[in-house]
C-alpha cells in the first residue's frame, strides 16, 4: 500500500457513534481543528440496539451532557416520538427521563449538526493503525493509504473492533446492523502495549408492525406533560406514538429449554462476557426457572417505519428457534421477523489503563471513550465522549484536564468506576452507583455543570444566558418565599386543615410551610397572593430544594469529607514498594492503577482502610521532607 500525507489536525476522533459524535463536537466547538473518521457516514449516531435515549440513571447522564454543552439532549428533543418520566412514585433523586427515538431521524439530524459544525471535518474511511512515537501520539494510517497527523486522538470504536456476529450455529465476521467490522486496528493497539479483551452484547429481533395484534397487549402511552432533555428547551409538544407491553409464557420458555443446547451462550461458542443488567431471554429463562413470565416491550423505531423493537427478548438462538419462540407471545402469533436477533463479540480495553481524564496512562495524547472502554449504552458512551473530546482539546491548548468527581455528576461516577475499579462486564450506569444521588439529580444538572462548561469554552453565550436566567429565577424565588409570612388567621388554618396539615399557632414563612411533607409549592398557591408566573421547571426546582433541604445539607457535609481525601495528592513517581507496612496486595494494585489522590486509592478493590492509613502517614512524611 502506498501511503500519502492527507492533512494535519489538532484532534482526530476514530468512530462516529454516540461517543465519537460528542467527542468531535466538543473538540471542534472548543476551537480545535478536528477530524472524525467513521466506517460509514450513513451510520453516524446509529442506534443498533434499543431505539430510545435515557432511562434510569441514563437520563441523568444525558442531562449532564447537555449541561456541559453536548448534543445528545438537543438531538433527542428534536427526534423523539414518545416521552416518559420513570420512577415518579419515588423521590426526585431517582426520577429519570426516557424518550423513544425516531432512530433514522436521530442519525440524520446528528449528521447534519456535525456537517455544519465549524472546524469539524468528516471522512468515511477505515483507520488501520496509529502512529505512536516514544509513547506519544503522532497520527493515524487509513486503509486507503491516507496518513493524518494530530496532537491528540480519541478512540471511540464502539463494538467494531474484530467484531463477530453470532446467531445459533452461524458465526461470521461483521459489525452491528449489517455493517463492516474493523479488523486491523486492534493489532496496532496491541503493538503499542494496549491490553485488549473480548466483551459481548446482543440485540433482539425487529418485527413487522403489520403482523402484530396490539389488542392482546397493554398500551403504554407517553406522558401528557413532555419534559425536555435539553435545558435549552422550556417545553415540547408532540403527538406521541405508544409502546406496548406483553409477556412470555410457559410455551415460550419450553421452546427455549428444548433448544438451549443450540444457544451459543450455553454450548461454549460465546466465551466473552456480556452485560449483567441486559441478559438474553434464554439467560433469563434458565437463570430464573421459577418465573412464569417475563415482560416484553414492543417499541416503535420511528414515525415512518413498520420496524418494531422487541425489548426484553435479546437472543443469539438460531433464527428458526427465534421465530418459533416469538410466535408463542400474545399478540405475536403471526409475527414476521424483519431483522434477526444476534449476539456480537468485540475487542475493548481494561479501562484501568486510563487516567481520570480518559487519556491512556502510557500513551500521551491518546484517549478512549464509549464501549471501547468497557461500558454499555448510548448514554454512557456519549458521556465519555464529551469528556474525552474536552480533554483532548484542553491538551492541545496546554491546559489542565477537566476531571469530574463522584460528587460532581453521574459522569464523574461512571468514569471513576471504570478507571479506578475496572469492570469485568459491559458497565451500565445505575442510580445506586452514585453515593450523592440527592445532590446529583437530573433536574439540577445545569446548576452543577453549566458554569464549568462555559469556563472551558464549550457552553456558548446563548446557552449561558439562559442558564443564568434560570439560576437567578430560582434564587430569587427561594429568597422571596423566605420573606412571605403566612399568618395564623382562621381562614388560613381552615385551608391548611383541608389539606390534611396542622393549623398554625403563630405566623410562619411560606418557605417553612412548603417544607411540610403533605404540602408543596403548588398546593399553597391560594395563600401566595404575590406568586410569580414561573416556568414549571423552576417551580419544580424550588419545591425540591425546599422540601429536601435538610437531606441536601447532610449530603453536602459528606461531600466536604470526601473532598478532603480527594485533595490529598499522590506523587506520580511514588514507589509503593518502599512504603513499610503496606500489604503486598495493596502494593500491587496501587502500583498498577497509580491513583492520583487518596480518595481514588481508597476505592481500589484490594486496598484496605489500614493500607490507606499507612499511605496517609507516608504522604505526610513525604511532603514534609520534600
Swiss-Prot record:
InterPro entries to which the protein is assigned, alphabetical: FAD/NAD-bd_sf, GIDA_C_N, MnmG, MnmG-rel, MnmG-rel_CS, MnmG_C, MnmG_C_subdom, MnmG_C_subdom_sf
GO terms for MF: flavin adenine dinucleotide binding
Top-rank taxon: Bacteria
Keyword terms of this UniProt record: Cytoplasm, FAD, Flavoprotein, NAD, tRNA processing
Gene designation: mnmG
Compartments in which it is found: Cytoplasm
Listed GO CC annotations: cytosol
Annotated NAD(+) binding sites: 274-288
Function: NAD-binding protein involved in the addition of a carboxymethylaminomethyl (cmnm) group at the wobble position (U34) of certain tRNAs, forming tRNA-cmnm(5)s(2)U34.
A Pfam family per the record: GIDA
PROSITE patterns documented for this protein: GIDA_1 (PS01280), GIDA_2 (PS01281)
Protein name: tRNA uridine 5-carboxymethylaminomethyl modification enzyme MnmG
Cofactor: FAD
Native source species: Clostridium acetobutylicum (strain ATCC 824 / DSM 792 / JCM 1419 / IAM 19013 / LMG 5710 / NBRC 13948 / NRRL B-527 / VKM B-1787 / 2291 / W)
Gene Ontology biological-process annotations: tRNA methylation; tRNA wobble uridine modification
Major localization class: cytoplasm
Amino acid at each position: 500500500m502506498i501511503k500519502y500525507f492527507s492533512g494535519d489536525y489538532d484532534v482526530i476522533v476514530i468512530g462516529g457513534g454516540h461517543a465519537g459524535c460528542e467527542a468531535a463536537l466538543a473538540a471542534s466547538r472548543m476551537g480545535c481543528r478536528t477530524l472524525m473518521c467513521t466506517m460509514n457516514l450513513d451510520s453516524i449516531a446509529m442506534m443498533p440496539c434499543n431505539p430510545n435515549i435515557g432511562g434510569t440513571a441514563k437520563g441523568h447522564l444525558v442531562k449532564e451532557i447537555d449541561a456541559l454543552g453536548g448534543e445528545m439532549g438537543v438531538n433527542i428533543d428534536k427526534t423523539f416520538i414518545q416521552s416518559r418520566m420513570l420512577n415518579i412514585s419515588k423521590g426526585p433523586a431517582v426520577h429519570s427521563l426516557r424518550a423513544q427515538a425516531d432512530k433514522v431521524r436521530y442519525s440524520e439530524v446528528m449528521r447534519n449538526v456535525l456537517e455544519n459544525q465549524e472546524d469539524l471535518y468528516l471522512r468515511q474511511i477505515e483507520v488501520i493503525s496509529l502512529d505512536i512515537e516514544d509513547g506519544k501520539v503522532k497520527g493515524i494510517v487509513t486503509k486507503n493509504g491516507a496518513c493524518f497527523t494530530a496532537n491528540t486522538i480519541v478512540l471511540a470504536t464502539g463494538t467494531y473492533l474484530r467484531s463477530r456476529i453470532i446467531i445459533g450455529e452461524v458465526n461470521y465476521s461483521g459489525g452491528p446492523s449489517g455493517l463492516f467490522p474493523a479488523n486491523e486496528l486492534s493489532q496496532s493497539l496491541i503493538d503499542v502495549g494496549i491490553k485488549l479483551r473480548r466483551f459481548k452484547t446482543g440485540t433482539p429481533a425487529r418485527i413487522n408492525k403489520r403482523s402484530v395484534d396490539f389488542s392482546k397487549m397493554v398500551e403504554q402511552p407517553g406522558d401528557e406533560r413532555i419534559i425536555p432533555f435539553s435545558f435549552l428547551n422550556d417545553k415540547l409538544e408532540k403527538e406521541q406514538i405508544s409502546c406496548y407491553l406483553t409477556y412470555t409464557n410457559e410455551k415460550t420458555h419450553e421452546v427455549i429449554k428444548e433448544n438451549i443446547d443450540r444457544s451459543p451462550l450455553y454450548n461454549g461458542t460465546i466465551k466473552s462476557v456480556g452485560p449483567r443488567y441486559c441478559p438474553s431471554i434464554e439467560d433469563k429463562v434458565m437463570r430464573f426457572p421459577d418465573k412464569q413470565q417475563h415482560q416484553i416491550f414492543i417499541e416503535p423505531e420511528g414515525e415512518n417505519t413498520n420496524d418494531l423493537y422487541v425489548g426484553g427478548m435479546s437472543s443469539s438462538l438460531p433464527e428458526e428457534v427465534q421465530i418459533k419462540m416469538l410466535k408463542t407471545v400474545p399478540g405475536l402469533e403471526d409475527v414476521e421477523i424483519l431483522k434477526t436477533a444476534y449476539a456480537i463479540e468485540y475487542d475493548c480495553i481494561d479501562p484501568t489503563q486510563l487516567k481520570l481524564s480518559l487519556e491512556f496512562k502510557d500513551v500521551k495524547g491518546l484517549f478512549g471513550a464509549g464501549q471501547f472502554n468497557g461500558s454499555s449504552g448510548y448514554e454512557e458512551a456519549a458521556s465519555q465522549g464529551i469528556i474525552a473530546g474536552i480533554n483532548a482539546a484542553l491538551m492541545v491548548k496546554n491546559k489542565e484536564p477537566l476531571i469530574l468527581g463522584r460528587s460532581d455528576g453521574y459522569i464523574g461516577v461512571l468514569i471513576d468506576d471504570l478507571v479506578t475499579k475496572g469492570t469485568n462486564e459491559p458497565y451500565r450506569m445505575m442510580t445506586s452507583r452514585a453515593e450523592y444521588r440527592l445532590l446529583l439529580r437530573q433536574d439540577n444538572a445545569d446548576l452543577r455543570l453549566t458554569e464549568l462548561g462555559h469556563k472551558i469554552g464549550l457552553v456558548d453565550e446563548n446557552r449561558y444566558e439562559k442558564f443564568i436566567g434560570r439560576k437567578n429565577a430560582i434564587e430569587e424565588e427561594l429568597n422571596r418565599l423566605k420573606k412571605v409570612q403566612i399568618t395564623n388567621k382562621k381562614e388560613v388554618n381552615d385551608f391548611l386543615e383541608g389539606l390534611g396539615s396542622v393549623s398554625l399557632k403563630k405566623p410562619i414563612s411560606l418557605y417553612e410551610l412548603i417544607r411540610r411533607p403533605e404540602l408543596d409549592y403548588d398546593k399553597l398557591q391560594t395563600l401566595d397572593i404575590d406568586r410569580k408566573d414561573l416556568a414549571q421547571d423552576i417551580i419544580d426546582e424550588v419545591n425540591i430544594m425546599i422540601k429536601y433541604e435538610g437531606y441536601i445539607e447532610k449530603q453536602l457535609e459528606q461531600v466536604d469529607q470526601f473532598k478532603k481525601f480527594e485533595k490529598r495528592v499522590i506523587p506520580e513517581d511514588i514507589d509503593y514498594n518502599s512504603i513499610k507496612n503496606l500489604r503486598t496486595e495493596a502494593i500491587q494494585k496501587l502500583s498498577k492503577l497509580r491513583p492520583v489522590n487518596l480518595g481514588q486509592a481508597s476505592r481500589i478493590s484490594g486496598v484496605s482502610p489500614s493500607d490507606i492509613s499507612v499511605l496517609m502517614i507516608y504522604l505526610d512524611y513525604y511532603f514534609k521532607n520534600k
